[in-house]
Amino acid sequence: MAHKKAGGSTRNGRDSEAKRLGVKRFGGEAVLAGSIIVRQRGTKFHAGTNVGCGRDHTLFAKADGKVKFEVKGPKNRKYISIVAE
């Protein structure tokens, strides 16, 4: 008779839910105040003019305008600003 022993258990098989991080509004796009621009872990992007930073480091628009990405400062940090139209 053909027999097969019971398979052993495994300690794998779990993964966390994706957090949907990343840039939500790109350079040159028009945004309204309150729009989320970037969802991030830590400050990969820093808040420039007319941009606020939430407690989870989410960057959001504080005014209506166009999104502008820029690299500035001695540490070449990436800043996101809103330029009023």
Curated annotation (Swiss-Prot):
Domain of life: Bacteria
Region (Disordered): 1-20
Keywords: Ribonucleoprotein, Ribosomal protein
InterPro entries given in the database record: Ribosomal_bL27 (IPR001684), Ribosomal_bL27_CS (IPR018261)
Positions of transmembrane segments: none
GO molecular function: structural constituent of ribosome
Keyword field contains Transcription regulation: no
Matches recorded under PROSITE patterns: RIBOSOMAL_L27
GO cellular component, one term: cytosolic large ribosomal subunit
GO biological process, one term: translation
Family: Belongs to the bacterial ribosomal protein bL27 family.
Name used for this protein in its record: Large ribosomal subunit protein bL27
Species of provenance: Salmonella typhimurium (strain LT2 / SGSC1412 / ATCC 700720)
Higher taxonomy: Bacteria, Pseudomonadati, Pseudomonadota, Gammaproteobacteria, Enterobacterales
